Amino acid sequence: MIKQIKRKKVKKNVVVGVVHIQASFNNTIVTITDLGGNTLSTGSAGAVGFKGARKGTPFAAQLASEKAAEKATEYGLKKVEVLVKGQGSGRETAVRAIQNSDIEITAITDITSIPFNGCRPPKRRRV
């Protein structure tokens, strides 16, 4: 039988990174990358344990960003720039949860795409 070679996973030491927060009405996804765009950690409301309509709540976004920040601090992350996309309810709480962790925020930018009269939007909901 051939012996398998086990390679040790090299932990990168990253000091500066970027936090991408994608907040839709149904879910909030937090991805923390280095400046090159390589993913260090991710967190989403579904991965934390929420299902269905509860994934879109601000509390779920808070727990998702706390989990992602906790994983990213293992890489030695100290300063981040925050990029927020979408108009979901978890936008502010996700940013606030990262502020409360050990990571210092240098800039907060909104990168939500707005059409210059592009595609026709879906019809209005009648509830």
Curated annotation (Swiss-Prot):
Assembly and partners are described as: Part of the 30S ribosomal subunit.
Q: Which family does it belong to?
A: Belongs to the universal ribosomal protein uS11 family.
Q: Which NCBIfam families match?
A: PRK05309.1 (NF003698), uS11_bact (TIGR03632)
The record's HAMAP family line, in alphabetical order, gives: Ribosomal_uS11
> What lineage, starting at the top, does this entry show?
Eukaryota, Sar, Stramenopiles, Ochrophyta, Raphidophyceae
Query: Which organism does this record belong to?
Result: Heterosigma akashiwo (strain NIES-293 / 8280G21-1)
| Name by which UniProt lists this protein | Small ribosomal subunit protein uS11c
Where does the source fall among the domains of life? Eukaryota
Q: Which GO terms describe its cellular component?
A: chloroplast; ribonucleoprotein complex; ribosome
The GO molecular function terms of this record are: rRNA binding; structural constituent of ribosome
